[in-house]
Amino acid sequence: MSVKAFDLVPAVEREQVMGEKVRINIECIECCGQHLYLGTNDCFIHHFLLEEHTTAKGKLAFNAQKLLHKYLGLKKPVVELKAASALERLIVLCDSAITVVDMVTLEPVPTGGAKLKGVTAFCINENPVTGDAFCVEMAVVLARRRAVQICTVHEDRVQMLKEVTTPEQPCALSLDGYNICLALSTQYMILNYSTGASQDLFPYDCEERKPIVKRIGREEFLLAAPGGLGMFANAEGISQRAPVSWSENVIAAAVCFPYVVALDEGFVTVHSMLDQQLKQTLSFRDGQLLQDFEGKVVVASSKAVYMLVPLPLERQIQDLLASHRVEEALTLTEAAQRNIPKEKYQILHRRILQQAGFIQFGQLQFLEAKEHFRKGQLDVRELISLYPLLLPASSSFTRCHPPLHEFADLNHLTQGDQEKVQRFKRFLISYLHEVRSSDIANGFHEDVDTALLKLYAETSHESLLDLLASENACLLADSAPWLEKHHKYYALGLLYHYNGQDAAALQMWVKIVNGDLQDSTRPDLFEYVVDFLSFCSNLDLVWRHADWALQKDQKIGVQIFTKRPTSEERRGQLNADDVITYLQKHSQALLLYLEHLVLEKKLQKEKYHTHLAVLYAEKVLGLISRPSTSEEQLSAARQKLQRLLKESNLYRVQLLLGKIQDSELLLLERATLHGKLEEHDKALHVLVHQLKDSSAAEEYCSWASASQDSSYRQNLFHQLLSVYLDPDVPGGAQTVAAVDLLNRHAEVFDAVRVLKLLPEDWSLPLLRPFLCGAMRATVHARCTSQVALGLARAQNLQLLHDRLKYRGGPVLVSEKKGCQLCHNTFSEPDCACLPGGTPVHINCVAKKALDLPHENAHHSNHT
C-alpha cells in the first residue's frame, strides 16, 4: 500500500548546467555536504553550492549557486566523481584514467606513485581498514584484466596496496572493509581481499542489463538480480532480508533507510526494506543517475538535478495511522529508532503504540489493542473518558492533545449498536481489572476503581462484590448513587462498610432482609448480617441490631454473641453476664449461649454450669409434661442433660436433685446426681431397685470410678454386688445379676471377699467364669511379680558389676606371682579376683565356694 515517503524537489536547473550548449549531458554526480559536483560529457566538472530553505507553504526547496566549472582538457566524458573530504580532494575517472583535483579550485593535484590508467570503474571504501584518517581507500577495476587493485589516495599521491585476481572481468564493484562485492561478466560474487575467501552469489548477464552493486550498510550490499528483483547479501553471501520486487529495467538504486529507491526509464520507485512492499511511485522522465549521499538522495536526468527529500518519519507514521495501517506504522516506528535520539524515540514510540491501540480498539480488535495500550503505557483515563459518566466528577483528567484518536465517546463509536456497546464495556472491565494492580494505575486509583465499580454495577458483573470486599479506592460520593441507581443495595452496604460507615451499611442490609428493598444478590444476607455483627467492634450497633436478629431467628441470631472472637481489643468485648441478662426473654438463644460458654469455651464458673443444667432439666421436664412430645425429642434432650451432669463438676447438685426428685422418668439422672455427692449406695439403689437396669448400674460404677484408683473401683463394684445380694429388699437377692456382674468383671473383684459374701448353696459351675478369671488374674499377678523381682535382681547385679569395674584398676598376673589360696604360680592368664583385687586361680575360688557351706555348718554347730 502506498505512502508518501519522498518529495521530488528541483535542485539544479537545466540552464545552470547547459547554459547555451544544447548537447551537454550530465554523466555523474557527487555530493559532499552542501557542495554538489557534476561531471558532464564535454569533460567539464561543475561545482554548485546547494542551500536549503523553507517556502511559505512549509515545503523544503533548494537554491543552487554555481561556484566554478573546470574543463579537464581531455574531450572525454567525466565518468565518475568521488569526494575525499578529509583530503579536500575530488577523485575523477575520465578517459579511463583516475586523476585527483582540488575540491575548491578543481585544479589537478600532482600525484606521485602509481599511475592509474585503463580504469573502467572504481569505488571508495566507506568502511576503511587502514586506520589513517588522511587517506582514502579505493578499489579499482582495470580494462581487460581479471583483477581488482586496492589503492590508497593521499593528499599528494596514489599508492597501490594489493592486486586481487578474479575469475572473470569485473563490470561493477562496491567495497566495505575487506569485502569486495563484484559484478562479473556472468555472476555476482563477494571476495575478501585479506583472506582470499570468496563466495559466489547468483548468475547475472552484464551484457544484457547493467549490473547494480550498492553498499547499503556494514558488510551488506544491494544487487540487481534477474527477474526484476533487488537482492540483499551480506559478507558471508547470505541474504538476511527478503528481496524487493522492482522493475526489470532498473538502471540505478539507492538506500535511504528504511527505503530502497530505484530508478528506471520513466519512474522512481520506493520500496520498504521492512516489508518489501512498494510504498511510492514518482514519475521521472529521462532518468540517468540516482545516488544517496549522507542521507540525501539525488536523482538526475541528463539535463537537471533533483533532490528526493524524505518526509519526516513521524509524518509518514501518522499518515499510515490515518489510513489505519497499524502494523506498517509500528514497523516503520521501530525502524526509525536508529535515526532518532533515544529519549525522543521513546516518547514517539509510546504515542504511536497508544494511537495504534485506539485504532484497533475502534475495530474491536481488543487483544491487540490491550497489548498496545500496555506497551505504550497508556494513561488508562484516556480510555475511561470514552465511556460517558465513568470518570468521577472530581477527576481532573483532560484528554491528550493532540488527540490519540478520532472518537468523541462510546456513543459516537458504536452509533447506537447495543451489542457493540456491551463488547466495549466487557473489554474495559477486563482491561481495568488487569491494570488496577499494576504500575499503570499509579496516581489515579480512584478513577480506575470508581470506573470499574460503575461498570460492574451496570452489567451485574460477579466481581462487584470482590472489588468492594477487597482494598479499593472507589469514591463514595460517585459510587453510592450509581449502586443505588442499579439496585445494588447489598454492594452499597459493602461500600459504606469499607468507608467506615457501618451504621449505614447495616441499615441498608436490614431493609433488604425485611423486604423493604429488593436485592437478591445474597440469599443468605441475614446470616451475613449476624456474622458481621459478631465481628463488629461498635457495641452500640451490636445491641441496637441484636433484638432484630433474635426476633428473626433465635438460633442464628444468637451467633452474634457465640461467634464473637475472644482476641479482639477489650472495647470490642461483651460481658457474658450482660448477654445472659439480655437473653432472658429469648429462651432458645439463652440456652445456646450457655452451651457456648460451658461446652465450647469451657468456662469454669458454677453459675453458668448450674444455669445450663437447670435449663436442660426444665426442658426435659417440659417435654415430659407435653403429650405431643416424640420419643426422639425427649431422648435428645435427656442425652444433653445426662452428658452435662456426668462431665461437669461445677453445678449445684442439690438444686438439680430438687428439680428432678419427683420425676419417676429421670431415675438415671438422679443416680448421677447421687454419685456426684458420693452417695453411691443411693445411686445404686435407684438404678438396681427402681430403674431395674443392671447395665446402667455397671456403667455407673465404671463412670464413677473412672478417675479413681483401683481400690476405689473395687469397692464400688463390691458395693454393687452387695446391693444385688441384699435379701432384705423387695424381691430378694438378684442372683442372676450378681453372677453376671462377677463373670463380666472378674478382674475387678477381690475373690476372697467375694467368696465370703456368696451364699454357700451356690454351685461351683455357676461361678466358673469368675473363679477362672480370678485364678488367672492371681497367677498372672504372681508371675508378673516374679519377673519383676528377677529383673530387679539382674539390674542390681549389673550395677554391682559396673561399680566394681569402675572402682578397680588393672589386675597383674605373672609366672612369678602366686595364688593367695594355693600359693602356686599362674601358668595361664585366666584368673579370678578376690575383694581388693587379689588374683587367684579360678578352680581355687570354685573349691573355696564349695567348702563354705560345710564350714558354716561346722561353725553353727559350735555356737
From Swiss-Prot:
Which Pfam family is one of this chain's hits?
CNH
Q: Which GO terms describe its cellular component?
A: cytoplasm; early endosome; membrane
Q: Name one GO biological process term.
A: endosomal vesicle fusion
Q: Which residues form the signal peptide?
A: none
**CHCR repeats: which residues?**
564-729
Localization, UniProt: Cytoplasm; Early endosome
Q: Does the keyword Transmembrane apply?
A: no
Q: Which residues form the CNH domain?
A: 23-297
Q: Which InterPro entries match?
A: Clathrin_H-chain/VPS_repeat (IPR000547), CNH_dom (IPR001180), Vam6/VPS39/TRAP1 (IPR032914), VPS39/TGF_beta_rcpt-assoc_1 (IPR019452), VPS39/TGFA1_Znf (IPR019453)
The domain of life is: Eukaryota
Per UniProt, the keywords (alphabetical) are:
Cytoplasm, Endosome
Q: Where is the chain membrane-spanning?
A: none
User: What PANTHER family does this protein map onto?
Assistant: CNH DOMAIN CONTAINING (PTHR12894), TRANSFORMING GROWTH FACTOR-BETA RECEPTOR-ASSOCIATED PROTEIN 1 HOMOLOG (PTHR12894:SF29)
Function in brief: Plays a role in the TGF-beta signaling pathway. Plays a role in vesicle-mediated protein trafficking of the endocytic membrane transport pathway. Believed to act as a component of the putative CORVET endosomal tethering complexes which is proposed to be involved in the Rab5-to-Rab7 endosome conversion probably implicating MON1A/B, and via binding SNAREs and SNARE complexes to mediate tethering and docking events during SNARE-mediated membrane fusion. The CORVET complex is proposed to function as a Rab5 effector to mediate early endosome fusion probably in specific endosome subpopulations.
Oligomeric form and interacting partners: Component of the putative class C core vacuole/endosome tethering (CORVET) complex.
Annotated family? Belongs to the TRAP1 family.
The name under which this protein is listed is Transforming growth factor-beta receptor-associated protein 1 homolog
